[in-house]
Amino acid sequence: MSKVHLIESPYALDKIKGIGPKRLALLEELNIKSVEDLVLYLPTRYEDNTVIDLNQADDQATVTVQGEVYSSPTVAFFGRNKSKLTVHLMINHIAVKCVFFNQPYLKKKLELNSIVTIKGKWNRNKQEINGNRIFFNDQKNQEDAHLEPVYRVKEGIKQKQLRDNIRQALSDVTIHEWLTDDLREKYKLETLAYTIQTLHHPIDKQNLLRARRTYAFTELFMFELRMQWLNRLEKTSDEAIEINYDINKVKQFIDSLPFELTDAQKVSVNEIFRDLKAPIRMHRLLQGDVGSGKTIVAAICMYALKTAGYQSALMVPTEILAEQHAESLMQLFGNTMNVALLTGSVKGKKRRLLLEQLENGTIDCLIGTHALIQDDVVFNNVGLVITDEQHRFGVNQRQILREKGAMTNVLFMTATPIPRTLAISVFGEMDVSSIKQLPKGRKPIKTSWAKHEQYDQVLAQMSNELKKGRQAYVICPLIESSEHLEDVQNVVELYESLQSDYGNEKVGLLHGKMTAEDKDQVMQKFSEHEIDILVSTTVVEVGVNVPNATFMMIYDADRFGLSTLHQLRGRVGRSEHQSYCVLIASPKTETGIERMTIMTQTTDGFELSERDLEMRGPGDFFGVKQSGLPDFLVANVVEDYRMLEVARDEAAELIQSGQFFEQQYSHLREFIKQNLRHIRFD
């Protein structure tokens, strides 16, 4: 079937008036490559140019007012090519002086007794408006004098040019309707054609809100249709592996562990085991705070797979993390399981032998990085794929690993506790297990906040920990100094400063510009206590486990979000020793102060993630480009979570009733297939 589009155009992008080769190249830089892209390039905000009554305006407010020109404008030139135009208007029965700087050409346009609309800053005492925009009363400008769309543009493209291009395209395209008449009527929604037109050219605020609501619901509904369809495919597949593990051997393994499972771990194990026994493929997210013991839960599941005759795989984001997992699992399993490590560093004969053992079934459990998804990595009988910190992998990487075991069971793990509203959006098709309990014997990390002038006192506190034979992390937001952020400390300067205080051999440096090999070497030295202090950027945020590290200093902590601060803090507090986290910050904003205060009040990652989401929004919560969040143009999973729930219910009803598979929805089914390529629909 040919490509299905939401928007169809009778001509190509370069046929629109004013779009030549140069403009075409600039538009492509904005990711506008077709007429459909152009029409869906929505404004980022709107300038409110609604005319108001000047009698009601506050002093020093930016106002848009309409009045009659009652004096001829005058222009005074001064300085080098500078000018001041003065004109008097009668506005709402008030005589007002209006001034415009460096716009002398307006003199010819401002005719005596004409009606004009002016936008500028109102000075009540002087009865004067410092103007920055003027609208003359021809029809085109009248349209702009209400809610004016503002687009993200780049040098070489003007707002007006882009608005004109979009206006022409909108007059000629066909916009298909995805929502049924019944659904639109039920929730009082507009047609998509009217909605997109309005988002570009709103008549008023109420009209704009209705359009935004319609488009957001359409996006969420389409997203949920994809989720629900995927659910149906998962549950009706006859390829799913049913794991008949040996429960007695599993119990013996759990009893042999050198510690007792927490109640939360036991609940998670039982939930996963129920999934493994079911005749449908497991698709579960295991989320738990830093240090909550997710790896032990994963290990028990891997052991269960071994007793059932299946292999398991664990994919993690970094080599150092893969090595740590492999080492701890080898110790945990002893001779009961054959654990292997596959990273980019494993090469030549060693790699060939490992792949041979994997394919013939000698290896029970394979731990690795993205090296696991290479074409020559073939499993004998994989029954469980575990991905750690899954929002740090691209969707395609996860999909390839999953497909190495056809319809194998999938467990995703994350130490970033995800608020319920976001979990629905990111992992909507998954069941979720949460570990909200720390293992016995762990002491809560003591978190404090110090100002920059208290730095020496913080150093003294760190020195006390080092004297006990412990280790410390020192975290900085920047790698090198920045002219834009002169007051922000950088990691290289701080590293050099600490070297002079503690000696070159005792201080290590870690940042994102280093090669993977150099980073691993530094982390290895820190793990083996060859280094006392590790000065680093946030590259240590994920999964690094050095139990002897009990002190963390985070410099310029107000530069980080709550979730990042919490993940960083989680690098300490990983043993029975008391750990400390000191935030050094002198925040200048209310948000910065609030963030520091919250961090000192709670160590609950679930509570912090909710607060972080409220303060920063979903894109920042996960980090740009890594999030796995659906790429909505209008909808916001936090602000629109109630709408998301309604969309999910409606999508579930459409699929479960079977209506979705009728002829009338064939166009929609094909669109979802073609535009969500990372999902298998066969």
Swiss-Prot record:
Q: Where is the Helicase ATP-binding domain?
A: 275-435
SMART domains listed in its UniProt record? DEXDc, HELICc
Which keywords does this chain's UniProt record carry? Answer: ATP-binding, DNA damage, DNA recombination, DNA repair, DNA-binding, Helicase, Hydrolase, Isomerase, Nucleotide-binding
- Sequence segments annotated as region (Wedge domain): 50-145
* UniProt function note: Plays a critical role in recombination and DNA repair. Helps process Holliday junction intermediates to mature products by catalyzing branch migration. Has replication fork regression activity, unwinds stalled or blocked replication forks to make a HJ that can be resolved. Has a DNA unwinding activity characteristic of a DNA helicase with 3'-5' polarity.
* Recorded domain comment: The wedge domain within the N-terminus inserts into the replication fork junction, where the lagging and leading strand split.
**Assembly notes:** Monomer.
Q: What is this protein called?
A: ATP-dependent DNA helicase RecG
